[in-house]
Amino acid sequence: MGAVPSTPRWGGSSSAARPLDTAEYLISTFIGDESFPISSDFWHKLLELPLNLQWPPHRVHDACQSLARNNYHTRHLAKILIHMAWCLQESISTSSGAPSLVYVKAVNAVYISSVFLKYFIENEKGDKIEDLYLSLDESEPIPTDITKDLNIEEFVMRSVLSFIGSIDVSPDTYLLHLELLNFMLIAMSTQLLSGPSPGPEDVNPFIDAAMSQESSLVILVVRKLLLSYITGPSISLNSASYSIYSEGSQPGVLQRVSSAAANLMLLPFNFLVSSSGEGSRSLLADCSLHVLLILSHYRKCVVGNEPITDISNDTTASDSLLKGSTHFSDNPYCKALEHATDVEFDRVDTEGNAHAGPVLRIPFASLFDALGMYLADEAAALLLYSLLQGNADFLEYVLVRTDLDTLLMPILEALYNAPKRSSNQIYMLLIILLILSQDSSFNASIHKLIVPSVPWYKERLLHQTSLGSLMVITLIRTVQYNLSKLRDVYLHTTCLATLANMAPHVHRLSAYASQRLVSLFDMLSRKYNKLAEMRDNQMQLVKGNSIEGNGLADDTSTEMHIYTDFLRLVLEILNAILTYALPRNPEVIYAIMHRQEVFQPFRNHPRFNELLENIYTVLDFFNSRMDAHNVDGEWSVEKVLQVIIINCRSWRGEGMKMFTQLRFTYEQESHPEEFFIPYLWQLVLSR
């Protein structure tokens, strides 16, 4: 059979005499305008040949355009997807022994499907996913093993997920697993055609099909994805891999996306479908994690009259009519992750704690270690957040670990290097610390863990520092960085809330951490005083009937109010230490005494005076004890500390006012998907 008229002319010598069974000819025929029945022998020839072509990007792009022109008539995209599902089903049934021809066919089918599906999704006009034509023509002869009304995306996703969930990763199956994960990411990328907040009109056929699978299959898939992430299998692909792109290049970028999500990310849709490439540690582990996160954070907005359990708390009139009749359907992957239990715990589980239905069981210890090892990766931080925020069993497991430094040290190092990190990653890490700080045993235990050295901390040498002191130092440093660069109120609040949770449980805070805590108050007070001066100057403009001055004064007053809250929160932190942990923290007392002048200007401030009364009660007590000691020569740091330590024993807290102990808890926003969906795709596309 000669080349069909619409087939691109690929060039090269002897093109007219090209054999009918070459990969180049078969691909050209696949994208042409002649429709081959789904039962035609053509499909077996196409899938049985190794696709070792090295096409430049423009040829791949031309091929995709050709299939797009002809697909309405040929339905070849739907047919290759059906053959892919058949190959996967056959691969599952013949999974034992050496890899057979069926594996070659499956890999080829997945890879070809990925290349062309990616182009179709990239170039969708509006939200017309139906232009994929995921159905067979009514005149198509249908084999007996499929029905006329076959839902192709459902059929395909069930086959893909069944293979991932039931077949172990091995040298023989590694490549197919990797290509399937790439295929899933491409198939689920229809999310990028919608806004960041899912609506009832959004069409995501493949990810919706994944959501409709039985819970038993969902649990198998989540377990395998987690295990692939934990073990990080890395197998050399060399001769086993192939690419129809020259030098691993791409056929193009996302040229048109009417998507708030994509616009927010400002990134090209240049996801690599090629098998060649390197991840941060294991390409399969990275892909597994990305697929798991996208599946578990997906939200399907549906219209219905049933009780609404997960809608916005927004009160705006524009949203109330829409969201009053819509809700998010349950996400089975999110549920599986939230109800996952430890395999070790399950062995000794009592009869009364048995869960109804299938439950995901994973090795928490291995997962804990893997997360600690790779927390520098943003996706790993997202997984840790998802588990701590949603899975009470995993949170409890983390809190009882005696080696919390496994998780905390990489988190603190990432925060230390905040200028090199994305703001989203900083938020995630700070929220993780806030969640952990809600537990009093965590706050107590971090001060018992001693870190021999902190090589990444450059400002000064930190030797034999408690993990708690290092956490205080790093959080304060993050506030200082935010104050000078990001100026994000939410970041400030999260840092200070974590410090406030820690404060009553502080034990032997280091000298440097104590100094930084008092310096934090000084830094915020200087910013407050500068704002107060600006406000006074602007008020003079207001008196001169300046409209501009009135607006500036309002802005400055708002900012002053924010800094008033920050200053009060720092005073609350100091108060909590002095009220509940003074005898155990002589360095904090020394730092306050050493810089006591920074508190004086605020002593009569109506928002601060009660809190400062306690600080001055402590100062008066220890200043009087210092005055009672006759010291020859000047006071040294050691001598002052010695007096403080001695008098800590006689401290009874007389005259101290008791304030309600601060306790901040993290509450996920009502529409977390508006943050997570764009963020997750940003990570996938930038890998």
Where are these regions (language model features)?
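Acidic, Ser/Thr-rich intrinsically disordered and amphipathic helical segments
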Residues: 25, 76, 83, 108-115, ...
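Long alpha-helical rod scaffolds of large eukaryotic non-enzymatic complex subunits
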Residues: 3-5, 35, 81, 92-95, ...
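Eukaryotic scaffolding regions of large macromolecular assemblies
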Residues: 420-687
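Alpha-helical repeat/alpha-solenoid scaffolds of the HEAT/ARM/MIF4G superfamily
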Residues: 31, 35-38, 44-51, 62-64, ...
